[in-house]
Amino acid sequence: MTMNRAKLDRLLKAAAHRSGQSRFVLVGSAAVLGRGKNIPADMLQTNEIDIYAPDADDIEAVTEDLQAYLGKDSAFAFINGNYVDGVTPKTAKMPTDWPSRTVEYAGIGCPGVIAIVPDLNDIAISKMLAWRDKDRTWLAAGTRAGMIDSATMHLRIDRVPEELVRDIPRYEIERRLDEVERFTGRPGKAARIQEIL
């Protein structure tokens, strides 16, 4: 269930072949492969990549097609053990200005295919909002490795569109940010930046 760049490249190549698209936005756990070196194993515990095709005329139609032919329950996944999770631009709840901090990943195993990779702190915000067990594991590993920073997350959280966070009380967001800070082994401090009412 561990992702690596060879698997990432194979999945991107398959997605490009299936969709006719050459550019994808890569979010989720596997995005760390497009940004980091010496990546902790706990950040790579996934067998999927989360992508969408930003240049497609109908992004959702491409997403649905990728899900059907390369997704979790597809023959492709059964044969390869890895799969494409087709997502949409709203799947990852990130700050509105995240596109200004992206890099492009061009793997040697997927020539001609580009993955647009958000900053890891923007992806970390999305994971902090989802807060599943696998997200907390990823956040803990990234924080301890110095790849993500709770203070940066705190500065950016208010730039996430309000409709994407309205179901999570502000005090709960602050509590989660505080817990991310504690993953470093230091006392939590993010929740004390402002008074929780």
Task: List PLM regions with ranges.
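Compositionally biased terminal segments of proteins
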Residues: 1-197
